[in-house]
């Protein structure tokens, strides 16, 4: 929690410098700047050291703090801090895993039990936010078949490409034009 407070205090002012419209961009910019000189091994070492502490810190956040409202911007709107701690951080790290695998040319080891659960959760929130009917077939180990409403657009796409589309990493048309920032 101490690191998060540091990032808020130092990162939020960076939003003006980088012409950002979302508060989290300043935090990301601060993380990049503070770690730009580190080697890959040093970054990995920091992650090994801090990662478990950060997860424990999430779970130790006092209940009153977990309900403090935070602005996520459209389409998510205002959500309690617990949304960020329980949902947002997990999805963010998972989505960056997709980015890293693509950037390094490594295959992403996907399972229905882990990755499929994340994808299903994302589909459910996405459907609730935009409310447009759809019949969605997501291919691959993290995929599944999802239906929302009746007589909706039929979409067949790889599960990971679906996530990349919702997050703006690739263009979306039709029902896939509704974003869900992760």
Regions found by a protein language model. Give the residues of each.
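Short, contiguous alpha-helical
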Residues: 1-21, 69-128, 162
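Short, helix-capping/interhelical loops that line the mouth of catalytic, cofactor-
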Residues: 1-60, 64-69
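Short, contiguous, pocket-lining structural segments
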Residues: 42-46, 84-88, 154
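C-terminal interaction segments
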Residues: 149-182
């Amino acid at each position: 929690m101490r690191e998060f407070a540091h990032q808020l205090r130092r990162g939020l002012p960076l939003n003006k410098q980088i012409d950002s419209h979302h508060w989290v961009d300043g935090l990301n910019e601060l993380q990049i700047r503070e770690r730009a000189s580190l080697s890959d091994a040093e970054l990995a070492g920091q992650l090994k050291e801090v990662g478990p502490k950060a997860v424990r810190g999430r779970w130790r956040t006092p209940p009153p703090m977990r309900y403090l409202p935070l602005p996520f911007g459209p389409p998510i709107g205002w959500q309690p801090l617990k949304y960020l701690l329980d949902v947002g951080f997990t999805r963010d790290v998972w989505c960056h895993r997709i980015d890293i695998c693509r950037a390094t040319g490594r295959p992403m080891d996907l399972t229905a039990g882990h990755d499929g659960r994340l994808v299903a959760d994302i589909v459910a929130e996405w459907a609730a936010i935009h409310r447009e009917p759809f019949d969605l077939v997501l291919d691959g180990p993290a995929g599944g078949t999802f239906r929302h409403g009746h007589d909706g657009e039929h979409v067949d796409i790889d599960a990971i490409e679906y996530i990349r589309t919702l997050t703006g990493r690739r263009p979306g048309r039709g029902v896939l034009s509704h974003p869900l920032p992760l």
